[in-house]
C-alpha cells in the first residue's frame, strides 16, 4: 500500500482480512485520535449508488460503476476511507474549529447486496458484512430507491431485517449499549411524489415496526421498542442525473446535518483509534468462524491486546536507560536513585502507558499497568540490590573497623593481670550504692588494664549496640530507594492488593517497597562472622593474659624448691596457690569469660509503654535517677536518632542505661568452639526483628546484663566456670613442672650449694678452717638435702585436687637418672674445689699464675709460634677453611638470593686477595734471600 492513499480495502472479495489496515491508519495520521472520530457504513443493493453517495457526501474516492459499460459489480469486499472535514473547519468560526478539529469520520463502503455474481452464496457474505458494520459503525446508511418502497428485495427488506436481528444479537449482552443511527437515504425522491414525513412513516410502519414485531426477542427485550436500539433518520435525495444540482444540494445538507447534529461526540463503540485495526480483525475473524459475536468480550480482547502492546512498547522504550543505569550500578552507588526512578522511569512510563491505554476498558488497563509496574520494579530491584550490596559492604567494613578499634587497646596491652587489688568489676558492684555512675566510669578507665577488662565485660553489649546502629543505617539508606507512585487508589485495586506497596489513600500516593531481605541476610551473617572473629581474637588475648598471669604466679615455685624439705608441705603450698589463682580469676574475670567464651541466652523484648514518638527520633521515658531503679539498672531501653554518628570506637563514655539484646534463646554469639548449624537463619531472624522495631519505631529492651548477672548467681554455671579455670591453671602447672623436670640437675646443684657452701647463718664456709671429717659430713648432708627434691617432686603422697591432674611419680625415670648423673658430676667438682682450698688455702685458678711466667713462656716459645703460623700458610690451610665457611654461610642464609650471593662473592675474593698478599709478605719476612744474592744485586 502506498503512503497517503485515502482508501484501502480491509476485507477482500473472498472474505479475507487485509492485514495492513494499521499501517494505513498510521500513514494517514488516524492512529492517535483516541475516541475523537466516528465510523459510518453504507448498506444497500448492488448498483444502487452507494459509492457515488459516499464520494459526494464525504469527498472520498471509492470506485463507481460506469453505466456506459453496463451494470456490473464495482465494490468488492469492504473498503475504508476517511473525511477530516478540513473545508468545513476552515470555513467555520473559531469555536467550531476547536470543536471539529481532529475529529474525522471513517467511511466504510460495503459490497452491495442481492449480487448475481455471488449467486446463492451472497446471503452468507451479506450477513457477515451487516454484522461487521453494526459492530463498528456509529451510523449505518441504508441506501434504497423511492420507487422500490413496497418491494421486498429492492427495498432491502431482508437486509433491514438482518440488520435489526444482528443489532439485537450484538448489543443485548452489553449494558448501556450505544444506539446505532439508522439513516435511510431514499434515492430519486421528489417532493411531488410524497412529503418526506410520509415516506418516513411508511418506512417506520411497514418496515421497522413490522420487522420488530416479527422478530424473536429475548425476554429482557420483549417490552422494549425499536427506539431503545436505534435512532431512525430518513432523508430524501433528488435524482442524481435528472436533478443533479438538487441532488448535490441535498447531499450538502445531509453532510451539514451529519457534522452538526447526527454524529456522536465521540466514537460510540469506545474503541481508541490505535486499536481500531485490531478490533476490525478480531470482529471479522469471529464472524467468519461462526462463533457467537460477543461485543463485550471482543472489547475485552481488544483491550487486553492493545494494553499489552502499549505496555511492551513502553518497556522497549525504557529498557535502554534502565540497562545503562544497571551497568553503572555495578561500579558505584547510584545517587538520587529515588528521584531518577520516580520521574525518569515510573512516572514517565505510566504517563506514556495511560496516554493510550486509558481509552480501553478500565479494569484491563489498570491490571496491565500493574504488570508494567511489576516489570519495572523487577528491573529496578537489580539496581537497588547493587546499591544495597555496596552499602552492605561499607557497613560491614565500618562495623568490623569500629568494633576492632574499640578493642585495639586490648590487643596492644601486654601487661598481665594484677590481682593484688579489687577488680574493676567488683568495685562497680560494691560502690554502686554510694558513687555516681560517671565517677565509677572515670575510675575504671584510669589504666589500660581496667579498660580492657571493662570492654571484655561488655563485649556482647558493645557488639549489639554497634549492630543495631548498623541496621538503623542500613534501613535508613534502604528507605531512600522506595518509590512513591501517584495513582487513583479508588479504582486501582491491583495496587491496593500488592504486598510491596504501602498506600496513602488520603494523598492518592502509593509507595513501593523494594525487597531488602537478601541483602539484610548477607549483612547479618557478615556481622555475625565479624563479631565472632573479633570475639575469638579477644578471647584468645584474654586466655593468653590469664595464662601468663598464672605462669608468673608459679615463678616463686623455683625459689621454694630450694628451701622446701617436706613433700606434704610443698604440695599443700602448691594447692593453696592454685586455689588462690582460681578464686582471683573467678572474682575478677568471670564476666569477661561469659562475654567472650560462654554461650549467651537472651530474649528479645519489645517495650511499648511510657514512650513518645516524633518523626525524627524515637523518644522514651527512662527514670534512671529513681531510687527504685538503682537495683534494677540492667533493664535498659534504647532509641535511635538518625542524626547520631554510630562511630562507637571513639565513644569511651557509653553507659549501661542503653543496652541491647543481641540474640534469641539460641544466641547469635554461639560458643566460640562450636559451629552450630542454622546460625545464618538465627542471625537473619533476629535481624528481621530489629528491622521491624526500627520500621515501627518501637523501643528496644535488652536483658543481656540481667542474664549475665543471673548466670553469676547460678551455682552450677559458676562451678563449671571454676572447673574451666582450674583446667587452665593445671595446664600451666604441668608445663611448669615439665620445665622443672628438664632442669632437675640445676635444681639439685642449687640445693646442694645452698647447704654445702653456706653455714646455718648463711655465711660462706671457710674451708681452710674445716677439717676433712667435717667436710665429709657437710658433703653427705648437702647431698642428701639436694637429692630430696626428687622425692618431693615425685608426689608420692595423696594431694587433693592435684591428683586429678597429676599422677604420682609423674617424672620419667630416664629424666631423673639423667639429672642425677649431671648433678653428681658437678657436686663432685664442687667438693674437690673445697678439698683443694682446704689443703692449699686457695682455689685452683689461672688467675693464680704469675704474670712473669706468661712472659717467660712467650719468649721461649716465640720460634714455635712462628713455625706454627708458617706451616698453616705454606699448606694453604687457612684459605680453604675460610672459603668453606663462607660458602656454608651463604648457602644456608642467603639461599636463592642471587644479589646477596654476588655481594658475598665480592667480599670473599677481596679478602682472599688480601690474604694472599699477606701470605706473600709473611713468606718474604720468614725466608730472606741469601747474603751472596744480595751482594750480587
From Swiss-Prot:
Pfam families registered for this protein in UniProt: RHD3_GTPase (PF05879), Sey1_3HB (PF20428)
GO cellular component: endoplasmic reticulum; endoplasmic reticulum membrane
Membrane side Lumenal: residue ranges: 870-872
Family: Belongs to the TRAFAC class dynamin-like GTPase superfamily. GB1/RHD3 GTPase family. RHD3 subfamily.
Biological function: Probable GTP-binding protein involved in generating and maintaining the structure of the tubular endoplasmic reticulum network.
Gene3D superfamilies xrefs: P-loop containing nucleotide triphosphate hydrolases
Cleaved signal peptide residues: none
Name of the featured protein: Protein SEY1 homolog
SUPFAM superfamilies for the chain: P-loop containing nucleoside triphosphate hydrolases
Keyword line: Coiled coil, Endoplasmic reticulum, GTP-binding, Hydrolase, Membrane, Nucleotide-binding, Transmembrane, Transmembrane helix
Domain GB1/RHD3-type G, first and last residues per copy: 34-280
Membrane-spanning ranges: 849-869, 873-893
InterPro entries: G_GB1_RHD3_dom, P-loop_NTPase, RHD3/Sey1, Sey1/RHD3-like_3HB
Recorded topology in the membrane: Multi-pass membrane protein
Coiled coil start-end: 319-339, 725-750
UniProt xrefs under PANTHER family: PROTEIN SEY1
Subcellular location: Endoplasmic reticulum membrane
E.C. designation(s): 3.6.5.-
GO molecular function: GTP binding; GTPase activity
Species the sequence originates in: Plasmodium falciparum (isolate 3D7)
Principal location listed in the UniProt entry: endoplasmic reticulum
Cytoplasmic side, ranges: 1-848, 894-937
Binding locations of GTP: 44-51
UniProt record, GO biological process: endoplasmic reticulum membrane fusion
